[in-house]
């Protein structure tokens, strides 16, 4: 009787690698500059000067807007047909393709998986206001395709003629990571050879600020110190700060990458998706299923808990969330103490895009063998037993890393990466 190979990377699963990245954040319009500024202890969180802050007297007046608009990078026809998220995803996908060396691929084997959290909800509100003011004729015949949740992924699929599937995970703050996880799964199952994957998110707007603020426990109101407001793992943390972003990566089989002499940045080795089944907006305080996602991603990568040298933490800066994640990490990795980084301290929280942003940061940490410092960590919470990198960058021998993403609704995603 023949024994089937174990379903892990390097045995039954093919090796998958990262060969391109593109990102725009509140710090910079590209991944490399964002990375350099993070290593230099810089923050993208600033005072917001949007008119709606004063109009609605919002209690949160800080956040991180992007440093660019996309309109001038698109044609008049594209602008007429695309909503904001489609514009972002299209521009990022073009940058990604260039970063990856403008590869010639079999489009029948190319897929797209791009998540979003809040999507185009605000644009729908604005369209409704127009219709109330000017009647049905105010609504464009292109409205549905511009604002449908899968629009950003669909636009990229059409741009690159992808025919191996187009996916749009909508799982709150885990959407970007879940999109990458699904892409990896499709590749190792033989459904695709390459994937454009990641996450995009809408602009900082009034209703999301108001909605999260009304919850009172999740958003920081340290308006007098924007850069110091988000304090992951700190004893005195009081919530997250919004920071706009979008991020995409190209992943493909190692065989495909080698065949075209691609510049390989890292390995993507395992991914796991679980759910808490606990509460709509609060994580399971024990971190049970989040920990299982981490452990499962490590197992699928063909690794042991002791192999993990670095964890890019979801760590939004809330009291309950950071503590639950610390428990999840410790449950999954046993006695191992990897170097932990919390990028939302510098970039803010980009909801549906953030998992993709932080996946790229994990790739860059493995590529450059250095981890940026977590900002604003003055007094580590005594209940959090983690080795959090703070103060200055930490060089090291980082072979394998895990990126965590968790979202409202009990979504948990963990992705295991390896240096190349």
From Swiss-Prot:
Designated name of the protein: 3-oxoacyl-[acyl-carrier-protein] synthase 2
Organism this protein belongs to: Mycobacterium leprae (strain TN)
Function as written in the Swiss-Prot or TrEMBL entry: Part of the mycobacterial fatty acid elongation system FAS-II, which is involved in mycolic acid biosynthesis. Catalyzes the elongation of long chain acyl-ACP substrates by the addition of two carbons from malonyl-ACP to an acyl acceptor. Involved in extension of the mycolate chains to full lengths and produces longer chain multiunsaturated hydrocarbons averaging 54 carbons in length.
Domain Ketosynthase family 3 (KS3): 13-419
Entry annotation: catalytic residues: 173 (for beta-ketoacyl synthase activity), 314 (for beta-ketoacyl synthase activity), 349 (for beta-ketoacyl synthase activity)
Annotated pathway: Lipid metabolism; mycolic acid biosynthesis
Catalytic activity: an ultra-long-chain di-unsaturated fatty acyl-[ACP] + malonyl-[ACP] + H(+) = a 3-oxo-ultra-long-chain di-unsaturated fatty acyl-[ACP] + holo-[ACP] + CO2
EC number per UniProt: 2.3.1.294
GO molecular function, one term: 3-oxoacyl-[acyl-carrier-protein] synthase activity
InterPro entries for the chain: Beta-ketoacyl_synthase, Ketoacyl_synth_C, Ketoacyl_synth_N, PKS_Beta-ketoAc_synthase_dom, Thiolase-like
Organism taxonomic ancestry: Bacteria, Bacillati, Actinomycetota, Actinomycetes, Mycobacteriales
TM ranges: none
Protein's gene: kasB
A GO cellular component entry from the record: cytosol
Listed SUPFAM superfamilies: Thiolase-like (SSF53901)
Stated family: Belongs to the thiolase-like superfamily. Beta-ketoacyl-ACP synthases family.
Keywords: Acyltransferase, Cytoplasm, Fatty acid biosynthesis, Fatty acid metabolism, Lipid biosynthesis, Lipid metabolism, Transferase
One GO process term, biological-process aspect: fatty acid biosynthetic process
């Amino acid at each position: 009787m023949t024994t089937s190979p174990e379903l892990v990377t390097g045995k039954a699963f093919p090796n998958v690698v990262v060969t391109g990245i593109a990102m725009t954040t509140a710090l910079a319009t590209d991944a490399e500059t964002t990375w350099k500024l993070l290593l230099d202890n810089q923050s993208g969180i600033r005072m917001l000067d949007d008119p709606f802050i004063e109009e609605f007297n919002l209690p949160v007046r800080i956040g991180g807007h992007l440093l660019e608009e996309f309109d001038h990078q698109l044609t008049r026809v594209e602008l007429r047909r695309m909503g904001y998220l489609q514009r972002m995803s299209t521009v990022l996908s073009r940058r990604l393709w260039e970063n990856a060396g403008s590869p010639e691929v079999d489009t029948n084997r190319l897929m797209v998986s791009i998540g979003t959290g809040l999507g185009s909800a605000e644009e729908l509100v604005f369209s409704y206001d127009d219709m109330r003011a000017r009647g049905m004729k105010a609504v464009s015949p292109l409205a549905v395709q511009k604002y449908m949740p899968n629009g950003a992924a669909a636009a990229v699929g059409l741009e690159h003629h992808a025919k191996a599937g187009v996916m749009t995970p909508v799982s709150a703050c885990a959407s970007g990571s879940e999109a990458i996880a699904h892409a990896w799964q499709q590749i190792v199952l033989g459904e695709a050879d390459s994937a454009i994957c990641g996450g995009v998110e809408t602009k900082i707007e009034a209703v999301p600020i108001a909605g999260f603020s009304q919850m009172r426990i999740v958003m920081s109101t340290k308006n007098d110190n924007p850069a110091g407001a988000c304090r992951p793992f700190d004893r005195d943390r009081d919530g997250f700060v919004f920071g706009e972003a979008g991020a995409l990566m190209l992943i493909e089989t190692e065989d495909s990458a080698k065949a075209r002499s691609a510049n390989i940045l890292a390995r993507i080795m395992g991914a796991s998706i679980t759910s808490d089944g606990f509460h709509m907006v609060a994580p399971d305080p024990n971190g049970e299923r989040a920990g299982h996602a981490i452990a499962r991603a490590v197992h699928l990568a063909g690794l042991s808990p002791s192999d993990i040298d670095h964890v890019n933490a979801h760590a939004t800066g809330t009291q309950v969330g950071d503590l639950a994640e610390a428990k999840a990490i410790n449950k999954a990795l046993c006695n191992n103490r990897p170097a932990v980084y919390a990028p939302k301290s510098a970039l803010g929280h980009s909801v549906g895009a953030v998992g993709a942003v932080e996946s790229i940061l994990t790739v860059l940490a493995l590529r450059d063998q250095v981890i940026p410092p977590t900002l604003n960590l003055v007094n580590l919470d005594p209940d959090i037993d983690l080795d959090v990198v703070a103060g200055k960058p930490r060089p090291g021998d980082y072979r394998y890393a895990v990126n965590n993403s968790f979202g409202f609704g009990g979504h948990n995603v963990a992705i295991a990466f390896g240096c190349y």
